[in-house]
Amino acid sequence: MEQTPKANRVHIGFFGRCNAGKSTLINMLTDQPVSLVSEVAGTTTDPVSKAMEILPLGPVVITDTAGIDDTSELGALRIEKSEEIIKKINLAVYVLRNDEAPTADDMMWLNKLKQNNVPIALFINEINASDSESAHNNDSNGNDTNLNYVDAYPDLSAIATVVGSTDFTSNRDRLTLLDLLGGLTPLDVEGEQSLLQGLVDPGDTIILVCPIDSAAPKGRLILPQVQTIREILDHKGLALVCQTEELPTMLSKLSQKPKLVITDSQAFEAVNALTPADIPLTSFSILMARFKGKLQDLVTGVKALNNLKPGARVLISEGCTHRRQCDDIGTVKIPMWLKKKGYTDLQLEFTSGGAFPKDVSGYDLIIHCGACMLTRREVLRRIDCAVVQGTPIVNYGVLIASLHGILERAISPFMDELDRKGFEC
């Protein structure tokens, strides 16, 4: 893995009316023609994303969205796509033109962002600005002469932070605007947390069991495995990697027992049998459940297995899109394990990527992947969506551990924090 995973970056969404200058601003900030720019309204259709670095924020993903007032034939669908972006971003940039007053649509969207607890940065596009103007021109009293627009509409500053104003067609203020944007505080950034928080100390040995089967990507490890190795290194620990069959050999060569064994969830049953009972064991998926979401809710959700009857509706949701293999964990192995444990005649439904139903009240159980490709904000939204609608939700690792009768062992490394939240296994 040579770049920061997309899910671990700060996600910044750009919003505003058609021809406000969103695409022009993005092209100026990235110094690349990321988005199509035209005087014709509605040139941005589906959201367009670009990964880059904005210091001191660090690695980010910026997303251009369709105009909020798109009245074209597909305008409603484009606006719906923009609304989906709100659920995934950590920071919003709202673009207004200095020659047009804010509209009711502008205020509605600004309030919509605020209601979703997304910090908002206002950028004012100075149409026909002179070359002498800059992002922050001050008069003799030190007042910002470019922000008179916002002064005229005080409702704006009550909702959003005014970052700056300039002519987006000019690159002269690019670095200034990048500095201003980089100094903002985004919402709920994953990078501020740790996948192995409280589990690894300097010098600790951690064994990672990484099965290589037909579903494994050729020539590389999967993202959770790579992220875990990096986390161990960051904590000055020792990362040892093997496949399931080599675990006994690796354990026999150690003079001291490892601090923790972490396995791919699909190998839980075999690794549990091979790992001595006095060595803590968990899985990459359960680590992700703790890192990305709410482990307590996901572990509580597994109790719904006791109530599954023939004909029950079960949603199995993947956060990424990949080609299904003959031993795919979501569409093949989990249904097989459920059937082996007596959960027969279930109505299984599947989603992948960004698809996730708004109404999940009709499901008896939601089984979600580890969500390594989704932002923490999106994972929390999905969990909250299920909890609010009274639908139990569990993730792959927790479910598989429960089906193999080892849930208590698999979550034992986290019992202190679960106990503090009043959890009962």
Residue ranges of model-derived segments:
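Conserved GTPase G-domain signal focused on the G5
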Residues: 21, 130-131, 155, 162-188, ...
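Switch II of P-loop NTPase G domains
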Residues: 43-49, 65-89, 95-113, 190-196, ...
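G-domain G4 guanine-recognition motif of GTPases
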Residues: 65, 96-99, 120-135, 146-152, ...
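Conserved G1/Walker A P-loop phosphate-binding module
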Residues: 1-76, 84
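Conserved hydrophobic helix-helix packing surfaces used for dimerization/oligomerization
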Residues: 12, 206, 312-314
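C-terminal effector/interaction modules appended to NTPase cores
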Residues: 17-23, 219-425
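Conserved C-terminal guanine-recognition region of P-loop GTPase G domains, centered on the G4
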Residues: 54-58, 77-163, 221-236, 246-250, ...
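C-terminal end of P-loop GTPase domains and the immediately downstream helical coupling element
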Residues: 166-233, 238-255, 316-317
